[in-house]
Structure formats: structure tokens, C-alpha cells
Amino acid sequence: MHGSRPRIGIAGQLPPPLGGQNLAIAALWKDLQARADIDSVFCPFQFTPTTGQVRRATWHKAWELLKVRNRLMQIKKEGGLDILLFPVGGPQTIPLIRDLFLAPWARAACRYFAIQFHAAGLAEEMKNRPSWLAKRVARLLGKADVAFIMAEANRADPEVCGISDIRVRPHQIPDQTNPLTLSKDRNGMLYVGHLGDEKGTPGLIQAMASVPQELSLTLVGDPLPPWSLQKFRDLAKQYGVSERVNIIGSRAPEEVGAFYSAAELFVFPSVAPYESFGLVLAEAMMWGLPIVASDWKANREVVGPGENFIFPPGRTEDLSQAIVKAAKGRERWPIIGLQNRQRYETKYKLGARLTLVEDLIRIAKS
């Protein structure tokens, strides 16, 4: 330990663009900076300035690799860290190349090397398409002293790397609700997150043609390539639901609460291979919303055993049926929402359990 104060670092990208991992890193960094008993260090990543560059190879990203390496070398030159939290990029080729290049430098910059699997899917990649790249990255990540996962459903990722110290630390978010800001006339369905095939957005728009006409849908988030907001609006028009589908686009985090407050039901049809936790599910529970979600990755584990509406992932028909089933029991939505709010308070509210930052500090002091 560096003197009497542990030196703790976090690497990663802060918003923009908005996304679960970027927002989680921002929250962790804010929590770390608030601690007066440690020295906090941030190693910024700036690989993806816009959502349109997600998982795309660009010269900017190649140059950023060298810049991040230099930042890590400078941290080591300044005495290194007691512990560094490194975010895994995910199972796609571009994130794997990033981790292949940076993981050794991150390992060398700290006494304890901690990795966080917010981006899941490495174990599945190793099982279905075990490329040389994935195998090599798994071996490098296996040099970590500890791995943090958001849910038990993600345990396979650090296990395939050979990491023995695996700790489940769900995201914890501060309570952003306020009785004065809650809409008295909550109405309609809401989706928050990236918009694209892997997130189930096209199927959700298609499903609107088969659900009760009184249900509307609001989509808040950036489109992933090759989609655009206009393409989604054209799709809604194609299925004859454009009058009931409101495609908002991205909004600042402080603005999103107004959409949660006004909604009556949250829908999350993701089938993304990198999905690990679904931060928006915890946010929906915080706002007391009942949930329709795909039975994918950790979704069922996150929402828990309550009366929410879980459907088999990947088929629009199953999504439609889940929404129709939810609509038939609409009178129970306030009760389900209250149950979800209680689950948020016991599991996902900031301070409800040992936080990841507190765990990092304990390890750094050991």
C-alpha cells in the first residue's frame, strides 16, 4: 500500500456516448472520488466518441490504444496503483483486440489487478467460436487477482479465464425518484437503451401491431449501426403503428427520469450477446414499474421472482404475447411496481449492500 492511503484506479470511458458500461464507470468514479481516505486515479478511454463508432475499426481507435498504453505507463512510473479496476470490452473482435493490447499494461500498473465483466459473452464466444484471439484474451484476463460480475448468470465469463476469486457486485444506483416529480397519470410503455437488432428494437416495434391499441410505446436511446432514428420511424410506419410509437433518441441521464416517471410499463427485449445486467431494469424498478423482459442472460435474476412478465428471447410473437398478457392484468401493475420498488431498495439502491468501491478499498488495504 502506498503510505497510509491506498491508491485506487479505475480505467474506462465516461459518457458520451450514453450506455450501460459508460454510465456505470461514471458512477464508480464519482463514488471513488467521494472517498477522503484514498487516492483515486482515473485512466480514461476515449475509443468511441459516438454510438455510430461502436465496434467499428477506425484509425482513431488505433491511436487511442497507444494513448491509453502511455497513460498506464505513466501511472506505473508514478509508483503504480494498489488496485486497478479494468473493464472487459466484450466478445466482439474490436473489443477483444483492445483487451489483448491493454490488459498486460494494466496488469503491470498495479499491485492487484481487478477486472469487471460489465460486457459479458466471452465464455459463449469461447464455446461457440473459440478463435485464437478470444483464447489469448482469456489467458491474459486470467492473470487478474479478482473479477467482479453483476449477477450469477455471468459467472461463466471469469471462470473460462481461470479466475478463482469471483465476486458478485450488482450495480447500485442512488434513488432519483421524487414524489413531486412522479406523474399522476402514468401511461404507456417505455424502453430505454441503445436501439438496434441486438436490443430487440425492431421486434418491439413490430409487436406493437399485435398489442392492444390503447398501449403506446416510447423509445429513448441512440440507434446502433446500421440503424438510424429515421429508419426506426419508417419501420413504425411500415407496421402501421407510428401514431403509437414515439422514438425520442438519446437524452441526458438527468432527463431520462421524466420518461420513467410518466411510463406505466417497462419493456426490455434485449438479446445482446454482451448483455450482463441490464442497468435499465434496476432503474425501472427504482421508478416502481412492472417489467416485460426477455429471458436472456441475467434478466430473470435481476428482476427476481415477482410477478413480472418474462418471455422466451428472440421471437416477436413471444414478445407480443407477453405484452398482451401484461395488459390483461393491468389492474395489478401498481402492485407489481411496488414489489419491484421494494426489490430495488433491498438490492440495487446505493448503500443497500457492500459496494464495489468498498470492496476495492478492502483489497487495496490488504
Range-by-range predicted roles:
Residues 44-49, 192, 216-233, 249:
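Glycosyltransferase donor-sugar binding loop
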Residues 8-10, 180-199, 205-212, 217-220:
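Conserved donor-binding/catalytic core segment of Leloir-type glycosyltransferases
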Residues 305-317, 325-331:
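Conserved acidic donor-binding segment of nucleotide-sugar-dependent glycosyltransferases
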Residues 261-276, 289:
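Acidic donor-binding loop of glycosyltransferase active sites
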Residues 218-243, 254-255, 332:
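Short, structured helix-loop element that forms part of the nucleotide-activated donor/catalytic region
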